[in-house]
Amino acid sequence: MRICLVLEGSYPYVHGGVSTWMHAYIQAMPQQEFSLWVIGAKAQDRGKFVYELPPNVKEVEEVFLDDALRLHGERQPVLFTADERTALRELVRLGSPDWDVLYRLFQEKGVHPLSFLQSRDFMELFKDICLQEYPYVAYADAFHTMRSMLLPVLYLLTGRVPKADVYHAISTGYGGLLACMGGSLNHAPVLLTEHGIYTREREEEIIRAEWVVPSFKSRWIRFFYMLSEEIYRRAFRVSSLFYNARRTQIEMGCNAEKCIVIPNGVQYERFCNIPLKQEDGWVDIGAVVRLAPIKDVKTMIYAFFEIGRAHV
């Protein structure tokens, strides 16, 4: 069996929790073949792996989002069908597009991303959105925001699709979308394992981001929610690490019957002989954390302080 792992910004380029897990996951099933379909931010990272890939990794398909910025070519007129036009309209409006129609449009029909983004259909949709949602925002800001939002997605939809018997996405977002496209085109099952809730992480980043025009922050957030809806709908199984994450997935629209929790385990033998603290009347609370903005360690420290002050 060939398993295609779809990853974004992690294995095999960087060390970390997801990467460590992925490496162990592949090594634990030497009888299975794996393809890696990996999304990176910059093409300059091509081939710069920090892991020695196990021998059962048979293929690595690398895709880099900044390559979308280098797309060029003259606009080729395209005559869209009614279904294609409806799906594209829903995509631009960040609604509920028929992704199967879009997969076929950009894969089988071979439509170039710029052929749509420079088409009359797109400009009419864009004009309507500006009039309805952003009447007081500069036209240039609106245009470049919309283009930068859609171009990477359309670029990903035109890329090569590795063949596999099952597609396993390790996040929603761009990676989840590629897994769904692979499953759709090759009639293969799709499953999702979320190490963290990708959409919520992007939402927090967007809220804090200075590069996002304030008027468009809600639109960027809607964009990532739209992507997550596709894999929550298509995946036959959705797993997370803890029950609050499962609850969040369900709140975001995933069918509860699909959602399971597989907690991280520990090797009990490594920790069972740690001596207990000598009794001194205090309750000591420790934390093993990674220093990263998404972990919000600062709030944890404040919480420890407030708890300690309340009980002095």
Located regions from the model:
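Nucleotide-sugar-dependent glycosyltransferase donor-binding/catalytic pocket residues
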Residues: V14, Q267, R290-P293, G308
